[in-house]
Amino acid sequence: MNYSALLDAISQGPLARWASILPEQIAEGLSEERYGDLPAWKTVLAQLPAITSSHTELAERVSIGAPGDCDETTREQLQSVLEALIPWRKGPYWIHGIHLDTEWRSDWKWDRVLPHLASLKDRLILDVGCGNGYHCWRMLGAGAKRVIGIDPSPRFVVQFHMIKQLAGLHYPVDVLPVGIEDLPEKLHAFDTVFSMGVFYHRRAPMDHLLELKNALRPGGQLVLETLVINGKEGDVLVPEGRYAMMNNVWFLPSCATLLSWLRKMGFKAPRVVDICPTTTEEQRSTHWMRFHSLPEFLHPENPALTAEGHPAPIRAVFVAEV
């Protein structure tokens, strides 16, 4: 997991302040003392077979290579290595004839988001809470100059490096084992910042909005996707216990409430561009994620409610500028 190309690329320019402290942050984020499973995951990564890919498709889907690029024995080895890092949450990926059918149909989310964005061509992009980096690849496929994803989960980081090793190390896309709080204050560097599926996990929502704003250059665009509730301005659900079996869900505002929060934090022209109930077709258990998923998180007698009796998940996409 080599970041030297990234560090060289950002050592000058708007990310130089971050580049100076990033090696230490990466070392801490991939500390084997802190994450006991990391040595085993690194061993698995080293077992990834070397396959020359005949093509890589990123615009319409993430597809690497073709079945004919390797023999069946090599493909079985590849599948075994990929399975060693189950669960795979975000995707799907097509890799040398293997359909990596992840828990989330993250491509559906991308199809909902992309039409509402300023062009990503030649943009420097930050993807906060990016998981294994699926959307980072789609951003690159939409023409981005460089994409940096951040996620503090080392399993997701290793999964990303598996995909990058298969696709090609030359691609200007990286996933770093850090959180947004690790970025230097008032960096004002990125053309577009994405925060998708993160906001409701933040205990201090206004602080998160400020962190996102401080990462953007003047005129840059924020893309915020989060869980919401139906309601008027001022309405917010704060689950006292779990929400859809998750114990780290803090604030689910109405769309009108979150728009007011964005204005409060100084974002310009905040707007809702998509509202979509999460379905059991979009989030479900698969071979690549064999644990409970949305069908088990909903009320067994009323799928309009979570297992705890809260409104079932609705996700909205907000876009704003600074």
UniProtKB/Swiss-Prot annotation:
InterPro entries: CmoB, Mo5U34_MeTrfas-like, SAM-dependent_MTases_sf. Belongs to the class I-like SAM-binding methyltransferase superfamily. CmoB family. It holds the Pfam family Methyltransf_9. It catalyses: carboxy-S-adenosyl-L-methionine + 5-hydroxyuridine(34) in tRNA = 5-carboxymethoxyuridine(34) in tRNA + S-adenosyl-L-homocysteine + H(+). Catalyzes carboxymethyl transfer from carboxy-S-adenosyl-L-methionine (Cx-SAM) to 5-hydroxyuridine (ho5U) to form 5-carboxymethoxyuridine (cmo5U) at position 34 in tRNAs. One of its GO terms (biological process) is tRNA wobble uridine modification. This is tRNA U34 carboxymethyltransferase. It is an enzyme of class 2 (transferase). Its EC number is 2.5.1.-. Homotetramer. Carboxy-S-adenosyl-L-methionine binds at residues 90, 104, 109, 129, 151-153, 180-181, 196, 200, 315. GO terms for molecular function: methyltransferase activity; transferase activity, transferring alkyl or aryl (other than methyl) groups. Keywords: Transferase, tRNA processing. The lineage of its organism: Bacteria, Pseudomonadati, Pseudomonadota, Gammaproteobacteria, Cellvibrionales.
